[in-house]
Amino acid sequence: MKVNKKIGLKKQRLSENLPGFSSQKKMAVIKVNKLIQLAFKVPSNPKPSAVSIVLFPYKNDIGFFLTERTHTVDHHKGQISLPGGAQDTNETLLETSLRETKEEIGIDVDLELIGTLSSLYTPVSNFLIHPYVWYADSIPETTLNNNEVSNIFTIPLNDLLDNEIIVEMPKEIKGVIINVPCFHFRNCDCWGATAMLLSEFKDILKNL
């Protein structure tokens, strides 16, 4: 199937009802029960933020970028994430998505908005994350903001769709080592909030 047709199908699907938390919770750090589900309930004063899944043609497939955060950022130090960050005053969340993507990894090309995924509240940082899905006609050139990003990885969508890469790995959370569900990609391990967002995206892609 040609890339443009694939993108068209994704755009159509993202305009329909989304699976939301039922998909996100599959990659939650702690098994989701009623108590944990309350932890993901959005409070009255969350910090709005936006992240970007930037799709582009890649080796007869479609790829997207993940980043490794530095150990000097305020939240989620050293973790694998999507480019994005907190909303500034007087900007829309869509504008936040584009601005943060440019600031973190230097993407400064015209992007086509494909759609949005379900928002996700992260209790650890009090962020309410709004994911935007974009498309670039070719692989965008990137320049890392070394204050926020230490590395960037290109992930083929076919890898995301491979159930074999979902594993449990030991991670330290608040001084305690626990096994967490993780996307064990070829070049990085993605867990936590970003994995929860990608879990919904994966379920959407599987049903195209």
Please give the residue ranges for each predicted region.
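N-terminal leader/linker segments that precede catalytic domains of diphosphate-processing enzymes
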Residues: 1-81, 85-139, 171, 176-208
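NUDIX/MutT-family hydrolases
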Residues: 144-184
